[in-house]
């Protein structure tokens, strides 16, 4: 695992946040976009439409920017940078994830795993999903 180089252990700003989840049958991208003091959380599913991969909005919700920062800092998402959860050799399939984020103006967080997740991953994913509602 890569050494975490962030001196400040809290996220103060979010410039980019995409948490991708891949299973055998589904690819989801949970994206957080900041607009002033509001945060829009969107969940997209990759679907093939007319033989072309398209990013289709399936869930969306809005909360305060402060609430998103609380979630990410509570579960120490900044410490996930460099996480690489290699797939267990005796597991046939499972769930893979990738986090790509830019925070605190220019700090990149990149984490990836397959059936092995950083501490707090499931709680962050659940908290983000609870903000969203299905889009018709």
Describe each PLM feature range.
Residues 1-24, 29, 56-67, 71, ...:
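Short, well-ordered, aromatic-rich surface patches in folded extracellular/luminal domains
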